[in-house]
């Protein structure tokens, strides 16, 4: 069902963050044992106060409220409060290994996070608007005297809203960890680091599912339910070989983990009022375990200049991807664990002053990455794709990894002259086309088209102590758009969404005490 519509969106967001750091360092008189500790509490909040979204169906030069197509006008209040407490205790012991200096590091950490999230939604419904004056498309008119419902005409707009329990949740994440690793030299040119990290992770959830929210007593009411708890070991090993005094060769192997966020591992259904897309949490998510191999060759110049060439390989078990919820609800998306995946690539980077060509105040910074990724489709995804395949279409058991670009380019040319106080730069970056949302059945995949970002900034420091600074910034100089498209076999690529951020200018002034 296609239609033409327009949406007026007015948003106000208020954010705050309050943090503190308590830390200390202690050592023995001989400096063979050092102790570092830190305690860092953080309070943060986000309040979206009175988001107003008004949608009209616009056809034949008329405006209409069409709930089945554009939805009712909405007013939404969202509130997120989070407390984070990070604690660390680290020991460093100096000693000798085979007659050479070595260091053993060991310690523990504990991280605690608490989140409270709530959405209040009210709909502006309408009754018998056809009996009133024609709508003009102005959002304010729906609450004017001419359109607000009254008992005499029994026609007009009115507010309707209920507390949606499934869109409110509380969560706790607790991570207790300990580690030990040893840094030592095998010979004058070769250094090795080996270690092991242990983590006990627990996540708890309070909230209700969709069924319980719709009909209390018929669904599930979670009260600090343990939704994720595991004990993991993360080994690491790296080898650093000094080719000469200006270059190193590094090899590394290590294991990491990616865990679902509060939002991902919830029963909440969170709508983006601007796009109409709904994010649906998933309480069945599990950890993603990542095994990593990498190598790097780096050459050093004076003044922190470097040239580096890297290669890497990653193996993902149970990666989390954003997937269309169902064939019947392709505009609703949910994070899900999918089949195992691999990512391999190479990166070249350079940071070089251009003084060798007579431009000592200019510096080139750039890096380029080329990446290959592959995900094994799980049985349900593969079967649904085969069942809905078009004539001549061959469905592969693998595909690209969601969110992974095949290439990345970053390039910047910086100018810095401390004598006259001028500094600035021109910066460009782009990522290759990547899978944004995994389709389901006959609903196609959504891809994000490369966005070419070209930005410029210029700063002037002045004053006796250079305490004043004027700045000019220009972002998206070429006025590129952020486009997402549907991609399917033997078809054109219609837009899923397009956004034109435009070119932006920024003026700044700073005074340093």
Regions found by a protein language model. Give the residues of each.
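Outer-membrane beta-barrel domain signature, strongest for Gram-negative TonB-dependent receptors
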Residues: 1-103, 304-308
